Amino acid sequence: LKIFETACPAFVPLIEEGIIENDIMDLTIQYYMDDFIRDNDKYIREDFKVNVYNKTEKTFVRKRRTNLAMSRVEYYNKIYPHIPEVQQAAVNAYTQAISSGNKGATSREINRRLRNGTEDEYVDVASRLISQALSRLPKYEGVVYRGETMSIKKLQERFLDHIGDVVSDKGFISSSLYMDTPMKFISRAGIPKSHKRVIFEIQSKNGRNISNISEFNGIFTLENQHEILFDKGTKFLVKKRRIEGDGTYRIILVEQ
């Protein structure tokens, strides 16, 4: 608290009175501690271990929506000690379910803004951190599966009109090692008549296995989606398509 009092004295009374919650206090201390370490590095023992965040990482850490993901840094460091914890936290936040306090950190919002080209500070830093993490995570080569419901018009424009062509996506692409997870996504009731159920069978070359740090890893939640994530901008050959007996479209993609 003494160091913190020197760095940002205005917060001390709020901490002592319990107005600032512990998790917020911890992140705030880290935020100011980085500058303190940088400005006073000659006084810091060489064996003193501390995470000093860069500008991009600071922007991510100080967002309230990342608190849950950042609270798991000890776990990340045990699983992948060579990957910066903030990068792993960005992947975890991306995979979290939408909630009242976490609408803008999830895959749906991030991908929506990436695909629409809508500027947003959080999406910019989070997507950069996710891409950095993916470059360090285990590569998966083999077949993976993705389930999606989409309008006939969108299906036609994005895939059916491009058999034999190479296509790409401005957003990240989630998939699973097993068929059961995507089948759950497309088997939900209430799909409009104008939409079709689609299963993508993807031959992965550079997809990254995020199953250990995903929100749905069998530890943070009981469900394990065995997720393989493709970086934004990944290119795929639309090899072929077929229609199953129940009307589900199956699109075969080959990562380029």
Question: Which residues are covered by each model-predicted region?
Answer:
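Mono-ADP-ribosyltransferase
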Residues: L1-Q256
